[in-house]
Amino acid sequence: MYARVTVVQGSPDKIDQAIESFSNGVMPAAQSVAGYKAAFLLADRQTGKGIGITLWDSEDARRRGAEAVAEARAAAIKALGAGSIPAVEEFEVVASDL
């Protein structure tokens, strides 16, 4: 399994808008890609920091997923009021109970 992790610093008062954008944009876009496994959005309501995680069954699916969710991810980042470019990293999941 493979993961894409996006870390964004935004505005605490925009967390709910970011959640809505992630839930209604990023997740459906990711779900449309063969090999999609799961998506998570972690949020710190005090600081406005958000971490989006998508899980994929292969590296190829992760690459296709990046293309599929690019527009929706940009909208979610904008909804959070991010003032900087997010950090995006990719990993192999080496232990999981999913």
Give short role names for the model-derived ranges.
Residues 1-51, 57-71, 78-98:
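Short S/T/G/P-rich N-terminal loop/turn motif that feeds into the first structured element of a domain
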